[in-house]
């Protein structure tokens, strides 16, 4: 049993609560607030990203590969340095660190500048095929100067009319199409994914 502030939850209940909060918070971030706002007066309501049939299908797909999945609480770089040397040749590491500019407002465990520097140093020196996504800001461009980058924009899936967020994709030891095509929800289209070369 896991103790909350005033209730006890077993692991399944706690896992579902975390899953529900992720799917009903803006961009999956608790501090981002509830989709539609507390008054639910927005165009999109609390359940905009909680499409049950789709989520059940995703969970089943993950469950089908559970023997290939390991969950760890290790720091991302510690994990990569530990398992990286033993990874298969055709393996891709993907890092999605906390945003540089708004990280402290969005995440409880946001990075300090030194943490971002450590990631950049790792990226510049690793032999692993590596993708990193960040907010596109001067500080990140400076940290990753000299590395291959691709700038792109995402349209948030809960509101197509919302302004685009400027992002940057940093890549090391991998060749990427000039302009990856991102589909709704932020995934690379299959045609672009097929052209990524290790």
Protein language model annotation of sequence segments:
Residues 1-94, 98-104, 137, 165:
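SAM-dependent nucleic-acid methyltransferase catalytic core
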């Amino acid at each position: 049993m896991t103790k909350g502030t005033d209730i006890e939850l077993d692991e399944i209940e706690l896992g579902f609560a975390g899953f529900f909060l992720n799917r009903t918070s803006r961009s999956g971030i608790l501090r981002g607030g509830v989709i539609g706002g507390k008054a639910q007066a927005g165009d999109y309501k609390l359940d905009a990203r909680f499409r049950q049939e789709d989520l059940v299908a995703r969970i089943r797909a993950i469950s089908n590969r559970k023997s290939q999945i390991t969950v760890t609480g290790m720091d991302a770089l510690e994990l990569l340095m530990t398992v990286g040397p033993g990874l298969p040749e055709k393996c891709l590491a993907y890092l999605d660190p906390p945003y540089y500019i708004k990280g402290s407002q969005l995440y409880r465990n946001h990075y300090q500048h030194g943490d971002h520097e450590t990631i950049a140093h790792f990226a510049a020196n690793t032999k692993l095929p590596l993708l990193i996504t960040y907010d596109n800001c001067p500080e990140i461009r400076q940290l990753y100067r000299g590395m291959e980058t691709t700038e792109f924009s995402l349209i948030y899936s809960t509101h197509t009319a919302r302004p685009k967020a400027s992002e940057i994709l940093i890549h090391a030891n991998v060749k990427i199409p000039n302009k990856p095509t991102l589909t709704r929800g932020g995934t690379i289209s299959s045609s672009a994914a097929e052209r990524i070369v290790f």
